[in-house]
């Protein structure tokens, strides 16, 4: 960001505090974990969060961090979140080895010492303390240096000051300087896709969207399964946790240095690649292969994970995670339906719970497509072949699901959250379930609305919801 823009943002913020960041290492395995301080950072920009909602009351996330006044123990700020470690610890690899991942905690810069408290959900979904750290904002080791310039911030949608809007930052990764115009076009296309669906369509007045393209020395990002390695500015790469389509940026320090140059509550990373892929972690970032035919869909789907902690509603695709103990998920769009008389969300009157649908036929078809997909990847087939398969799958599944007796009704449809049995979603089809041309389901929209409220306050609606 150019110096005049930095100054303008600082002046516009008035007394808004700067953004303070605690960088930490998160180490462990499937059964144990610990956190350790890396460094304290005072970021260059004011804190973008809503000053009227500093304490998180949404009960989302596998983890929760709190910032408390050291002298009085008064709660000053909190946020629920998920993390790379929190996902990795559920993989088979975590049963065999220890690994360390880097993560950050951002909050309004305090004017006196505070206590950072990190909590994690236990088996009953209650948050239990796992780490504390005393933070003195006047410590001589607080890093106040300016990050290396990452380019000029592009204003895609400006609806108001950062502290009164939900601020989405779109970062490019793997774009050379000559390709940054391509990135900008892709970022605008992705934004259009987001604003075409509810609740974002009717709440565009509650959003700011900015983009930033740090120039890469080489075009593209890493894809280890094909022998491709790139030292890209944000460090995004395919094959996370051994899943060929899962794209993560594991160099959190590098990611934060780039992102700190624009106001953000949430971040989407567009990777310069054509191969289908992406990822989304609540409160961390979303990723998408911007050159893929399916980029608009993946962008919206992964932001569902990132912004509102929405669970995947599908149950037939291969994932790296191992099944866990059956407890009610904290995610708002899935349930184990422990009490059918009291479902997790409002149900369409007259809809039976559980809600019948032809799951067996769907599952047979879906698994057939999965086998074809694996075969294409195994022989490194062209992406056009994968696109054709996905288009065929979309046609078949759209026709099937739209013809279900309870299509477009809110109920409890079995099959969700990677589980074919015992887990339920609110509608038969949804952006979090398939690549079909459908909206977010009712449960997803409600969760997303609540998060937008948290950052932007009362809704500024520009069109009616569905």
List each language-model region with its residue ranges:
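N-terminal prosegments of processed precursors
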Residues: 13-103
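Catalytic Zn2+-binding segment of zinc metalloproteases
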Residues: 303-319
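Short, aromatic- and glycine-rich surface loops/edge beta-strands on solvent-exposed regions
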Residues: 103-124
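Fold-level signature of zinc-dependent metallopeptidase catalytic domains
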Residues: 139-201, 211-221
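Edge beta-strands of extracellular beta-sandwich domains
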Residues: 123-140
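Short pre-active-site segment immediately N-terminal to the catalytic Zn-binding motif
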Residues: 180-183, 278-303
């Amino acid at each position: 960001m150019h110096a005049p823009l930095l100054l303008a943002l600082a002046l516009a913020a008035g007394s808004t505090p700067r953004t303070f960041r605690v960088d930490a290492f998160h180490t462990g395995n499937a059964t144990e974990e610990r956190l350790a301080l890396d460094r304290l950072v005072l970021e260059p920009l004011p804190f973008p969060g809503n000053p009227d909602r500093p304490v998180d009351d949404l009960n989302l996330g596998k983890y929760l961090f709190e910032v408390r006044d050291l002298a009085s123990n008064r709660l000053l700020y909190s946020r629920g979140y998920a993390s790379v470690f929190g996902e990795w610890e559920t993989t088979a690899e975590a049963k065999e080895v220890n690994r360390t991942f880097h993560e950050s905690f951002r909050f309004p810069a305090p004017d006196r010492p505070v206590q950072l408290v990190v909590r994690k959900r236990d088996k009953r979904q209650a948050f239990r303390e796992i780490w504390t750290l005393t933070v003195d904002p006047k410590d001589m080791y607080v890093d106040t240096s300016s990050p290396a310039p990452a380019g000029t911030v592009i204003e895609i949608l400006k609806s108001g000051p950062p502290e009164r809007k939900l601020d989405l930052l779109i970062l490019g990764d793997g774009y050379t300087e000559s390709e940054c115009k391509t990135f900008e076009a892709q970022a605008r296309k992705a934004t259009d896709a987001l604003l075409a669906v509810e609740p974002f369509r009717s709440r565009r007045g509650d959003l700011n969207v900015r983009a930033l393209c740090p120039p890469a020395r080489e075009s593209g990002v890493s894809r280890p399964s094909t022998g491709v390695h790139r030292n890209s500015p944000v460090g995004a790469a395919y094959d996370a946790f051994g899943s060929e389509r899962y794209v993560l940026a594991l160099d959190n320090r590098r990611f934060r240095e780039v992102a700190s140059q624009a106001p953000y509550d949430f971040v989407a990373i567009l990777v310069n690649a054509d191969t289908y892929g992406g990822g989304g972690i609540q409160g961390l970032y979303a990723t998408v292969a911007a050159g893929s035919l399916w980029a608009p869909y993946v962008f919206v789907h992964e932001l569902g994970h990132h912004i509102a902690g929405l669970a995947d509603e599908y149950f037939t695709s291969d994932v790296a995670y191992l099944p866990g103990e059956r407890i009610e998920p904290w995610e708002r769009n899935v349930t184990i339906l422990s009490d059918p008389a009291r479902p997790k969300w409002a149900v369409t009157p007259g809809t039976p719970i559980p809600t019948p649908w032809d799951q067996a036929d769907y599952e047979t078809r879906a698994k057939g497509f999965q086998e074809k997909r694996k075969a294409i990847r195994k022989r490194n087939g062209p992406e056009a072949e994968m696109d054709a398969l996905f288009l065929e799958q979309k046609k078949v599944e759209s026709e099937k699901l739209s013809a279900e007796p309870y299509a477009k009704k809110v109920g409890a449809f079995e099959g969700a959250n990677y589980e074919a049995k015992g887990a339920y979603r609110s509608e038969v089809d949804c952006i979090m379930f398939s690549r079909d041309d459908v909206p977010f389901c009712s449960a997803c929209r409600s969760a997303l609305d609540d998060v937008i409220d948290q950052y932007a306050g009362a809704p500024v609606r520009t069109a009616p919801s569905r």
